[in-house]
Curated annotation (Swiss-Prot):
The protein, known as: Sulfite reductase [NADPH] hemoprotein beta-component
Catalytic activity, EC: 1.8.1.2
Residues that bind [4Fe-4S] cluster: 436, 442, 481, 485
Record-listed siroheme binding positions: 485
Assembly mode: Alpha(8)-beta(8). The alpha component is a flavoprotein, the beta component is a hemoprotein.
Lineage: Bacteria, Pseudomonadati, Pseudomonadota, Gammaproteobacteria, Alteromonadales
InterPro entries per UniProt: CysI, NiRdtase/SiRdtase_haem-b_fer, Nit/Sulf_reduc_fer-like_dom_sf, NO2/SO3_Rdtase_4Fe4S_dom, NO2/SO3_Rdtase_4Fe4S_prot, NO2/SO3_Rdtase_4Fe4S_sf, NO2/SO3_Rdtase_FeS/sirohaem_BS
Catalytic activity: hydrogen sulfide + 3 NADP(+) + 3 H2O = sulfite + 3 NADPH + 4 H(+)
GO cellular component labels: sulfite reductase complex (NADPH)
Record-level GO BP terms: cysteine biosynthetic process; hydrogen sulfide biosynthetic process; sulfate assimilation
């Protein structure tokens, strides 16, 4: 299946490629695995296929050694991620989401993600089907939330420009729906639909074919000046261009991605390239063209080099652009001027142009759970029972109670305050900072992130206060490994797990997310990290220029050099100032 150059043929295909080809369009032996009660696990091959259905197999790493001593298999469970385009859901849907977390997961919590959806942790294999059917009863699903397909499409939740948000969200939803896998495997296995006879790939999967994409694919729609969706970190981004408050089209960007591997310099994070302006009505033509070029040109031999960013680097910007235009049947127009600004959320009440109010709530670590003195989950449940608008999850792991009428504000605020959802002082830095889940559930984590990050941030805030600039926000992000789920390489201060208690410290990304950071210190512990930041903060306060952000400052003084072309200079050695 190809519209142009074919899939890599010079090297042997990866194991995953054979798995997909032989899976009967993502069915594999998942059904048999579900029916096997002797283990809480799926087979090795099915563990790859279940990702396309929206979940990963995990185990509690805190208990691994104990269970091994008891001669028990690891305590297997599953993390399921929903597909919620643009992070928008109704109060009724949220009540269903909430009930599932309380009855079918051991974590008894809901985790908001950095891609505007939610995920559950601690699901046993025997509860998977019941949980997925519960989501389905609320018109929600987990199809393509993971796997080598177009994943959850992000969209700026802009609570002010409601008309523009509505138009941008329309396209985010179109992109999400249009590029869902067409296989009936999900409905058959989880919802009990009758099995349909399968035919060849072009009929079943007209865009993907039977081998789907070489790797995950991420899309986002940004509404300037906000860049909360970190549009340049996506495989494919659409930057809204408006005239007199109406959407006219997008600047298309492509080739971003955060993941890399420690010690392997052929892997690197990368920000997307600007390709030009497209009219709104051509959005799907260009999206499909980019997907198909990646399908046919992407590396299917080495999964570490399979993302679109490596495809563009390999074939070159001009060749890639020409092929996309050829397949779309439309040329790019010159990029329109837009201003890319803040990546943070606007906390508290914001009034939109439609005179409706929107309340953005800070959710530490994106973890919605009842805590001592802060029954957050109960609070959102009570709000959902009375709210007449919708809910919006943000890419900073926060939660918006959207479209609140003036007369309903007081009741919703009272519930938010009485349940600990409002009232706590959030610094500019904490409000812009995110961490991935990491230990104990993520199999890839080398160090803590979510569990440790709040305390670490408190120590950074103390340093900011010591140096007199606590009122200024710094974008800080932490991940347990270099796969980059919390987009650490686009943070002014990035911390990437190397080993338990040890992190690589990255500096120098721009505040707006238009430049990557770079390695400053490797494999260091908390005391060393804080010592380095203490010294840099002292210099920053003494030497900064008017309006200069911390990330820009670290580049100007030579603490790190600017990343201009990630393929060439992200791993370039640098003598620190």
């Amino acid at each position: 299946m190809s519209d142009g150059k074919s899939v890599e043929k010079e090297e042997a295909l990866s194991v995953n490629e054979h798995l997909k080809t032989d899976s009967d369009f993502l069915r594999g032996t998942i059904q048999e695995g579900l029916d096997t009660a002797v283990t809480g696990s799926f087979s090795e091959g099915d563990q790859q296929l279940i990702k396309f259905h929206g979940f990963y197999q995990q185990d509690d790493r805190d208990l691994r050694n104990e269970r091994k001593e008891q001669k028990l298999e690891p305590l297997y469970s599953f993390m399921l991620r929903a597909r919620v385009a643009g992070g928008v859901c109704s109060p009724e849907q949220w009540l269903g989401v909430d009930e599932i977390s309380s009855t079918l997961t051991s974590s008894n919590s809901i985790r908001l993600t950095t891609r505007q959806t939610f995920q559950y942790h601690g699901i046993s294999k025997r509860n998977l089907r019941t949980l997925i059917q519960g989501l389905d009863s609320k018109a929600l699903d987990s199809i393509a939330a993971c796997g080598d397909v177009n994943r959850n499409v992000m969209c700026n939740p802009n609570p002010v420009e409601s008309r523009l948000h509505e138009q941008a969200y329309y396209w985010a939803k179109q992109l999400s729906d249009q590029y869902l896998p067409r296989t009936k495997a999900y409905a058959e296995i989880w919802l009990g639909d009758d099995k349909v006879a399968t035919s060849e790939g072009d009929d079943v999967e007209p865009v993907y074919g039977k081998t789907y994409l070489p790797r995950k694919f991420k899309m986002a729609v940004a509404v300037p000046p906000d860049n909360d969706v970190d549009v340049y970190t996506n495989d494919l981004g659409f930057v809204a261009v408006a005239e007199e408050g109406e959407l006219v089209g997008f600047n298309l960007v492509a080739g971003g991605g955060m993941g890399s591997t420690h010690g392997e310099v052929q892997t690197f994070p990368r920000l997307a390239d600007d390709f030009g302006f497209i009219k709104a009505e051509d959005t799907l033509k260009f999206a499909e063209a980019v997907l198909k070029v990646q399908r046919d040109w992407g590396n299917r031999s080495n999964r570490k080099l399979s993302r679109l960013k490596y495809t563009i680097v390999k074939y070159g910007y001009e060749a890639f652009k020409a092929e996309v235009e050829k397949r779309a049947g439309v040329k790019f127009e010159p990029k329109r001027d837009v201003v890319i600004g803040d990546r943070g959320d606007r906390y508290g009440w914001i009034k939109g142009v439609d005179n409706k109010w929107h309340l953005t709530l800070f959710i530490e670590g994106g973890r919605i759970k009842d805590l001592p003195g802060q029954p957050l989950q109960t609070g959102l449940r009570e709000i959902a029972k009375i709210h007449k608008g919708d809910f919006r999850m943000t890419s900073n792991q926060n939660f918006i109670i959207a479209s609140v009428a003036e007369e309903d504000k007081a009741e919703i605020e009272a519930l938010a305050r009485s349940h600990g959802l409002m009232g706590k002082l959030i610094t500019e830095t904490r409000g812009r900072s995110i961490a991935c889940v990491a230990l104990p559930t993520c199999a890839l984590a080398m160090a803590e992130a979510e569990r440790y990050f709040p305390d670490f941030l408190s120590k950074v805030e103390s340093l900011q206060e010591k140096h007199g600039f606590l009122d200024q926000g710094i974008v800080i992000r932490m991940t347990g490994c270099p796969n980059g789920c919390a987009r650490p390489f686009a943070a002014e201060i990035g911390l990437v797990g190397k080993a338990p208690g040890r992190y690589n410290l990255y500096l120098g990304a721009s505040f707006e997310g238009t430049r990557l950071n770079k390695l400053y210190r490797e494999n260091i512990q908390e005391a060393e990290i804080l010592s380095e930041l203490d010294s840099l903060f002292a210099r920053y306060v003494a030497e900064r220029e008017e309006g200069e952000t911390f990330g820009n400052f670290t580049v100007r003084i030579g603490a790190v050099s600017a990343v201009i072309d990630a393929a060439k200079d992200f791993h370039e050695q640098h003598n620190h100032a």
